[in-house]
Swiss-Prot record:
GO terms assigned for molecular function: GTP binding; GTPase activity; guanosine tetraphosphate binding; translation elongation factor activity
Protein name: Elongation factor Tu
Spans annotated as G1: 19-26
Species of provenance: Klebsiella pneumoniae subsp. pneumoniae (strain ATCC 700721 / MGH 78578)
Annotated spans, G2: 60-64
Gene giving rise to this polypeptide: tufA
Amino acid sequence: MSKEKFERTKPHVNVGTIGHVDHGKTTLTAAITTVLAKTYGGSARAFDQIDNAPEEKARGITINTSHVEYDTPTRHYAHVDCPGHADYVKNMITGAAQMDGAILVVAATDGPMPQTREHILLGRQVGVPYIIVFLNKCDMVDDEELLELVEMEVRELLSQYDFPGDDTPIVRGSALKALEGDAEWEAKIIELAGHLDTYIPEPERAIDKPFLLPIEDVFSISGRGTVVTGRVERGIIKVGEEVEIVGIKETAKTTCTGVEMFRKLLDEGRAGENVGVLLRGIKREEIERGQVLAKPGTINPHTKFESEVYILSKDEGGRHTPFFKGYRPQFYFRTTDVTGTIELPEGVEMVMPGDNIKMVVTLIHPIAMDDGLRFAIREGGRTVGAGVVAKVLG
């Protein structure tokens, strides 16, 4: 069994626990690692190892997150769990832990609570594609009708936020009993793992997506033309392929006539690599940092979008004062800042440091964007918030 661990051939899937405080997210995380280690090999993680989550920084924001790993026979999972509600909000908005799917933990003793709703809404806004439900503490509920009622409430709540509530897998279990080694409840953890394997599709790898490279620098090389450099965000660029230059200015088409890395010429540049791309017939001044190179027709420039944002607290180095509706900060997308104006939701007059809020942003220049793109909010180069494009509007 111990040989399992070194197999790097299994598909890698990112998941996490979400749900209301004290409904048992961390206990479930410990139970999954323990039961799966016992059944399929791998290492168990104790509750307290997960609970005192280390601090990490994402876009200048401090987040407490625990990362655990576990295996099923067909997949390798990386799982994130956060101790506090604020950590979840920050984590989901910054995309520090991108999830291919989430396990929503709901205590059968309480049913859905305010944070249950908020985490489902956040999941919808930030693009968590799949949710599986673990109905926890079922050992404490004898009444079958009550369990059915809670299940129905959870399904309705999911449907309300455009998740397929009627078809969502719901597992009735007890994380604590499973952790204590009770076989009846351990079986429920195996059932949950089975849903992870079958309900969450294998994520598309960055390399299989359409090519996109955020431009960091532009050089002109005499006799050869213009070179742009940056890290390939997704896909592959091959010499001879057509690309579009998108954002800030009118979209332009050109051809890649060369790819180089560390001064060596290559046939192609792949997701994750830092490359220089030589472009045919483009002048140095026609292209700038903040634009992207992309496979033609795969991404468009936009100026207006709905977003979900988290505003840093004073302790995190954010603003000391609230802001109001005339606020005009910079929005930092990929490699550049663009000034924008904001519209707050109806009835909201001001936003305090430490808040998370939905806002509509209008930028002064178009930026290549899709739903799910992350950004920072800055004032004079200092990060004061983080956000995600929930829906492109225009």
